[in-house]
From Swiss-Prot:
Note: Seedlings silencing PIN3A display abnormal crown root development. Seedling over-expressing PIN3A exhibit better shoot growth, longer roots and a greater number of adventitious roots than the wild-type when grown on PEG-induced osmotic stress.
Gene of this entry: PIN3A
Chain segments carrying region Disordered: 281-312
Family, as annotated: Belongs to the auxin efflux carrier (TC 2.A.69.1) family.
Species the sequence originates in: Oryza sativa subsp. japonica (Rice)
Record's note on what induces expression: By auxin and osmotic stress. Down-regulated by 1-N-naphthylphthalamic acid (NPA), an auxin efflux inhibitor.
Name of protein: Auxin efflux carrier component 3a
Length: 618
């Protein structure tokens, strides 16, 4: 039976943590003491120094030779049971088409990864004595070294599948090597782009580079760009609401690319300042000051040119103005060559070192129903290796090149309106079902795509996980703390007093600063419940009911009884860990749910853990 003294001891250990949290919350929300920039600086100090040194302090002072292996086995079994259940569930057909891998990662985080370091150690010491604090440190070691690494592996696996399925929907099985540039630290979203080279045997050698958008975002001072007109607009696009006069002459354009000139119309019989010398010259924009573009995306639709018999492309693509840009060796420009148009290989096609253009046309875009709604689809330009060809990707579909383009361009859907200028990655990537029952391979189609060999994918994921780990201060603090504890408790070596006090002066502040940082995070959020009430209820049920239930079953199966069983169940009912939320936000996998689990879970965790403590003590 829990006495009043025991209850007060628990409250005395936990309430000060909440005082620090609410003090930070009020400093931002009520009193306006800290600005968002100042909060960011405080959070960075906590992430770089306070929490890693706190982890090092606890791990380095814990005896690794006295670890309770049965307790650790119960914790490991709980996580393996959850992983096995989620893996089996993810293989089932999805009725809604929602990615099962995303939900599997989120549910694993909610059910098995509590805030053991900040909340668990002081709470369990107050409840069950100092030995339970040692057990919590052992859990922290496994979390930092094994389970957070596994989380990174799952997130990078998901990002790699999405990247491969998006960039190589039909040819992924032909990839034999994946080289990752040193500056690529994540495969998620717009952080990476790909370039492929086709070998003589038809195999693909892919290079993963940092996205040009990510590189440009690092520039502090914007500089003039010599890239002019780097987009292809349609007449139905409303990106530029102010029309201006145009000097672009479609007759010049069709003459340059080998097609016959269109019949003169009032909209086209105007002098053009856009000539072949500008189109094909590499020196057209060498000057330090960028020139104003004369291209007008709002000019009248060009007339349909007559079809040519061989070699020349048929430029009757609906609602498209084709505009080619030039590039020079500017420090801002990401493109070193000049893309030019060429025909298939017959008469009339220009041959001035031109690259061949392949157009990827979507097969399932909705047709214009005349309702006046605009349908915009973003595409991408994929720089190919080998033959120097280029692919224009309009969101996925079949590739058209050479003479085949003459037959296929006529079927271009009206819904196709805009193609972006990104060199490899789509501005808005397609939603690819990577978790369907047919996701393992086969011909690319609805819900199906091919994957590279397992060895290639494994090497890619391990490279990315390793780069994440070596940039994480907690990795070093955990490994160094474990290494020192192995040496210190084996040969009874004491840490030098200067080093010990230097670490303790910061680690002592780590607990309070971690809670203070959490309060700042809560204050900066627009809502405590960011994911909706129903999702919040489900996440709280998984966190505080499903997790402890699986932990109880695993502990009983291992043979834990008495106080050890109680400690195992209560630590599984702690609030949600912060590190899984950081991962979820970085990889954009249900960040609202994890944010709600951290914030709202922290508010209700104290009464819930006290309820478990009282019920288990009966």
């Amino acid at each position: 039976m829990i006495s009043g003294h025991d209850f007060y001891t628990v409250m005395a250990a936990v309430v000060p943590l909440y005082v620090a949290m609410f003090l930070a919350y009020g400093s931002v929300r009520w009193w306006g003491i800290f600005t968002p920039d100042q909060c960011s600086g405080i959070n960075r100090f906590v992430a770089i120094f306070a929490v890693p040194l706190l982890s090092f302090h606890f791990i380095s002072t814990n005896d690794p030779y006295a670890m309770n292996l049965r307790f650790l086995a119960a914790d490991t079994l709980q996580k393996l049971l959850v992983l096995a259940g989620l893996a089996a569930w993810s293989r089932l057909p999805s009725r809604t088409g929602a990615p099962r891998l995303d939900w599997s990662i989120t549910l694993f985080s909610l059910s098995t990864l509590p805030n053991t370091l900040v909340m668990g150690i002081p709470l369990l010491i107050a409840m069950y004595g100092p030995y339970s604090g040692s057990l919590m440190v052992q859990i922290v070691v496994l979390q930092c070294i094994i389970w957070y690494t596994l989380m990174l592996f799952l997130f990078e696996f998901r990002a790699a599948r999405m990247l491969i399925a998006d960039q190589f929907p039909d040819t992924a099985a032909s990839i034999v090597s994946l080289h990752v540039d040193p500056d690529v630290v994540s495969l998620e979203g717009g952080h990476a782009e790909t370039e492929a080279e086709v070998a003589a045997d038809g195999r693909l050698h892919v290079t993963v580079r940092r996205s040009s958008v990510s590189r440009r975002s690092l520039l502090v001072t914007p500089r003039p760009s010599n890239l002019t007109g780097a987009e292809i607009y349609s007449l139905s696009s409303s990106r530029n609401p102010t029309p201006r006069g145009s000097n672009f002459n479609h007759a010049d354009f069709f003459a340059m690319v080998g097609g016959g000139p269109p019949p003169p119309t009032p909209a086209a019989v105007r002098g053009s300042s856009f000539g072949a010398s500008e189109l094909y010259s590499l020196q057209s924009s060498r000057g330090p000051t960028p020139r104003q573009s004369n291209f007008d995306e709002h000019s009248a639709r060009p007339p349909k040119p007559p079809a040519t018999t061989t070699g020349a492309l048929n430029h009757d693509a609906k609602e498209l103005h084709m505009f080619v840009w030039s590039s020079s060796a500017s420090p801002v420009s990401e493109v070193s060559g000049l893309p030019v148009f060429s025909g298939g290989g017959g008469g009339g096609a220009l041959d001035v070192g031109a690259k061949e253009i392949h157009m990827v046309i979507p097969a399932d875009l909705p047709q214009n129903n005349g309702s006046g709604k605009e349908h915009e689809e973003y595409g991408a330009v994929a720089l190919g290796g080998g033959g120097g060809g280029e692919n224009f990707s309009f969101g996925g579909g079949k590739t058209v090149d050479g003479a085949e383009a003459v037959d296929e361009e006529a079927a271009l859907p009206d819904g196709l309106t805009k193609m972006g200028s990104s060199s490899t990655a789509e501005l808005h990537p397609k939603v690819v079902d990577v978790d369907g029952p047919n996701a393992g391979g086969g011909a690319a189609g609805a819900g199906q795509y091919q994957m590279p060999p397992a060895s290639v994918m494994t090497r890619l994921i391990l490279i990315m996980v390793w780069r994440k780990l070596i940039r994480n201060p907690n990795t070093y603090s955990s490994l160094l703390g474990l290494a020192w504890s192995l040496v210190a408790f084996r040969w009874h070596v004491s840490m030098p007093a200067i080093v010990e006090k230097s670490i303790s002066i910061l680690s002592d502040a780590g607990l309070g600063m971690a809670m203070f940082s959490l309060g700042l995070f809560m204050a900066l959020q627009p809502s405590i419940i960011a994911c909706g009430k129903s999702a919040a209820v489900v996440s709280m049920a998984v966190r505080f009911l499903a997790g402890p239930a699986v932990m109880a079953a695993a502990s009983i199966a291992i043979g834990l009884r008495g106080t050890l069983l109680h400690v195992a169940i209560v630590q599984a009912a702690l609030p949600q860990g912060i590190v899984p939320f950081v991962f979820a936000k970085e990889y954009n996998v249900h960040p609202a749910i994890l944010s709600t689990a951290v914030i709202f879970g922290m508010l209700i965790a104290l009464p819930i853990t006290l309820l478990y403590y009282i019920l288990l003590g009966l």
